[in-house]
Regions:
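Basic, amphipathic "hinge/linker" alpha-helix immediately C-terminal to the N-terminal HTH DNA-binding motif
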Residues: 1-8
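C-terminal regulatory/oligomerization modules of transcriptional regulators
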Residues: 12, 27-100
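A eukaryote-biased feature capturing mid-to-C-terminal, repeat/solenoid-rich segments of large proteins
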Residues: 13-24
Length: 100
């Protein structure tokens, strides 16, 4: 198989796959009920801070590489939306957890 043909096959393979959304921090979330409430609050706060730091880094990269083609810029936009969604989800989760 030649280079371009192999490249196109790879592109179609990845475009046709399930889109996994597995985050390493889900291990922390899944085990928060095994630590004290105080510790859980600290872990949630640390997770929020980590997401904010990652979002800021993504924003900085988007500014730094603002002149790249749309296909690259749109990845920064996608990541921005994901970080914002994660922060909203974390707020909701924390509110629900505080009621339990």
């Amino acid at each position: 198989m030649k280079g371009k043909e192999y490249f196109e096959k790879l592109m179609f393979t990845y475009a046709s796959q399930d889109v996994p959304l597995l985050f390493d921090f889900n291990v922390v979330i899944a085990n928060l009920n095994k630590v004290s409430s105080n510790e859980a609050i600290k872990l949630i706060a640390q997770l929020r801070e980590s997401i904010k730091i990652s979002a800021k880094a993504n924003e900085d990269y988007a500014i730094q590489y603002a002149t790249i083609p749309l296909v690259g810029r749109t990845i920064f936009e996608q990541q921005k939306l994901l970080y914002n969604s994660l922060l909203q989800w974390l707020d909701s989760f924390e509110a629900q957890m505080s009621k339990e």
